[in-house]
Every structure is written in structure tokens, then in C-alpha cells.
Amino acid sequence: MTKPRTLYDKIWDEHLVHESADGSSLLYIDRHLVHEVTSPQAFEGLRLTGRTVRAPQKTLAVVDHNVPTTDRSKGIADHESRTQVEQLAINAREFGVEYFNELDPRQGVVHIIGPEQGFTLPGATIVCGDSHTSTHGAFGALAHGIGTSEVEHVLATQTLIQSKAKNMRVIVDGQPSEGVSAKDIVLAIIGEIGTAGGTGHVIEYAGEAIRALSMEGRMTVCNMSIEGGARAGLIAPDDKTFAFLKDRPKSPKGKAWDEAVAHWRTLHSDEGAHFDKEVRLDAASLPPIVTWGTSPEDVATINGEVPRVESAMSEAKRVSIARALDYMGLKGGEKITDISIDRVFIGSCTNGRLEDLRAAAKILAGKHIAAHVNGMVVPGSGLVKQQAEAEGLDVVFREAGFEWREPGCSMCLAMNPDRLEPGERCASTSNRNFEGRQGFKGRTHLVSPAMAAAAGVAGHFVDIRTWR
């Protein structure tokens, strides 16, 4: 009798080219996404050694990190950023790789355009020189970030040397209450397991609450797997997955589609499959979540308070809390709802999709941002922007006092003009709240799109379940 396998086991086995005595393995890579920041040296390595891209049709390039989200007809002011963008265009043209430049309507954040185009498929191995490649695991793909030297290796060979990770399952049962989103669920998971909880593992997300999520919500959860320490995150594909992918530009068509779906239906963990680690959460008991510190595990409920240094169980944790409080300009015992904000950022590969913008616009309709708050909405792609404008969401945002921007990574990270000033506090829908992540001495609180929008109007964090 065949040994029961996890979803991760199945995808790994299907892509295993060779297994070495030292435990390392050579995996075949189905899809490779590249952007302007981590690919220049990789392409230059190919050039210097006289190599070509082995499978150009399995590689897709896009600019996202460095591009401005304001008027692009003026170009990119920063020399290094401009050079990286120009070099990606040169490399894509020279090596025959499809490329979405900053003026292409399909351009956007790399982890949003992959699924949009049907480039992301269930059961595929997907890599990108970006840690949030785990996003694509929402489709039942084994997806993770790689370094620049590995980018070169994949370009040249369409393979990657890997060591197999352990299996971890996070089961989220119950139905979340109104106002509790996928972002709250994943922040609660990270708060439970910590930023090292998934280290050495690939996480499979399962349970009633996960199955109930839309594909956009599932992408939000898988996106932040890396913040939980995991190499990748997975959700078994189902009819929602297939409906999302059907008729996408790069999805299989006709008979090939039917055959693909038949195979994709086998991509689930078998009954009795072994998981090295398992965690359970009840979504029904979750309130909206806000991070208070400088790590994604520093979470609090909206009706909670900032932790006190003396509440920590270890000296190391006390030191960590004290440092975070000092950086964030907060005091232990301060109510989360008493924390005022200066900026709102709605966007990123975590929460820059159409569903996210709809959730924020629903909160903002007929309201206006607080006088002391500056807000920006950055669609995750040109296609998201087009659809949002077709639905009139841009009008809602503008009338509420928000800036409506062009697609890109934007204020998720301080690699472009969108950044916080020292001491500014931001309600952000992105994925990392590290020191300086959004700008030198900037203070980041991670929240859902609806929570960010409401905070912008109130000028401080509020419980959207009761706030009007």
C-alpha cells in the first residue's frame, strides 16, 4: 500500500530530478518570475559565461520594486533605480524573456501579476528572487523565494538545488466574524507560532476558515508564510482555484485545461499523511489584529493593549519589548485604540488586490480621512487599477482624501519615492514592520485594508466591528 503523502510531498516528488547522498536534491522548476532588483547580476552571470536562458517561455519579468507610483512620464529620478529598470528591459530583450515594463497595462507587483496572467498554476514549482514568492502557494503551488545566485542557476538550468523541508499544518476552523479578514487570520497565526515557528518547514493551511476564503484571501495568508519562518505556504486547490484560473491568458485551454484540472484535483494531502508539526486556531474567536512592535509576531487585538516590559517571561523578551516600544514611541499598557496615526498605505503583494480595495472603499464611502492623516492607495497591478476604476473605487478613495496611485511595491519598502519620514506612524496593509522598513525611523503597524481605511478616517485605530 502506498504511504500517505502530504501536498508538499506530492509536488516535491513530481519535480525531483536527482537526490544526492548528502541529502540535497535537484528540483525541476516550472515557473520563474524575475524583477529589477535581484536579477541584474544573474543575467550578467549568464552573459559572462556565454549561457542562455534555458526555458524563456517559463520565465516572466516585471518591474515593481523601484518604479514610481506617480506620473511615470517623468521617468525615475533615482539613478540606481532607473539603471535597474533599464537593465531589466535590456536583459529581457537580449535573453528572449517576456517583460512587462512600467508602461504596460499588465505591469504590477510580481506576486499579483503571476496569478492574474495564469502563469501561476496548481502543482507547479515557482521561484522568484523575492521572499514573498510564497504568495503563489495559495494555488497549491510550491513557491518560495531564492537568492540572486540561485536566480542565475534557474535561468541557466531550469533546476534548483534544495533540501527538503519538514511538513507543518496550520488548521483554522470556524467562521470569522464580520470585519475579520484573511489578514487578521494570518497575523493571528504568526502571533501564535512566532516568526520562527515555521522555520525548516513548509506550511499547509487547512480548515473551514481557510476553505471559505476567496483566492485573494488565500494569497494574503500564503504571502506572509515567510513572516512565520516557513520556506513556503500551501493551500490545496479546489473549485475556487480552478474558477479563478480559467481563461486566464497563460492558463491551459481546451482539452489541456480539462486534463490539468483532473490532475489538480489529486493535489491534496492524503488521509493519514504525516505532519511534523500541527497548530490549530479558531477563527470564530478572532478579533481584528494590529501589530504594535517591530516584528510581525508583535500582535495585539484591536480591543487589547501594548504589552508591558515586565509581562515578558524571559530577559531576552523583556529587552526585545523595551527596544520595540522605544522605536515605536509607545508605552506599555497603552490601548491599541488610543494609538494615533499619520499615514495610511493600502497596497502591496499582501493586500493590493481588487477585493482588498473594495473592502477599504466600503469603509470609506461617504467619509473623509482625518485632517492630520495622509493616505495613499496603490493598486497591485495595472489590471487591478483598471477594474477598480471601472467600479468607481478610485472616486471613493479620492473623495475620501486618499491619493490614487500607479501600481508597484510602493511604500511596502523604502526602495522608491514612497516612504515614511522619521517618526511618522503608518497603518499599513503590507507584510513587514521591521525598523526602517517603510523609511528611516518610520513606524509601521500591520493591519487589514478595512482597518487601515477606518484608522485613516478616525485618525487612530478603531474596531471596525462596532465603529461607524
From Swiss-Prot:
CDD domains: IPMI (cd01583). Transmembrane segments: none annotated. GO terms for molecular function: 3-isopropylmalate dehydratase activity; 4 iron, 4 sulfur cluster binding; metal ion binding. [4Fe-4S] cluster binds at C349, C409, C412. Binds 1 [4Fe-4S] cluster per subunit. SUPFAM superfamilies: Aconitase iron-sulfur domain (SSF53732). It catalyses: (2R,3S)-3-isopropylmalate = (2S)-2-isopropylmalate. Keywords: 4Fe-4S, Amino-acid biosynthesis, Branched-chain amino acid biosynthesis, Iron, Iron-sulfur, Leucine biosynthesis, Lyase, Metal-binding. InterPro entries: 3-IsopropMal_deHydase_lsu, Acnase/IPM_dHydase_lsu_aba_1/3, Acoase/IPM_deHydtase_lsu_aba, Aconitase_4Fe-4S_BS, Aconitase_4Fe-4S_dom, IPM_dehydratase_rel_enz, IPMI_cat. GO terms for biological process: L-leucine biosynthetic process. Pathway: Amino-acid biosynthesis; L-leucine biosynthesis; L-leucine from 3-methyl-2-oxobutanoate: step 2/4. Its cofactor is [4Fe-4S] cluster. The keyword Lipid metabolism does not apply. It comes from the Bacteria. Its EC number is 4.2.1.33. Belongs to the aconitase/IPM isomerase family. LeuC type 1 subfamily. Heterodimer of LeuC and LeuD. Catalyzes the isomerization between 2-isopropylmalate and 3-isopropylmalate, via the formation of 2-isopropylmaleate. This is 3-isopropylmalate dehydratase large subunit. It comes from Methylocella silvestris (strain DSM 15510 / CIP 108128 / LMG 27833 / NCIMB 13906 / BL2). The gene is leuC.
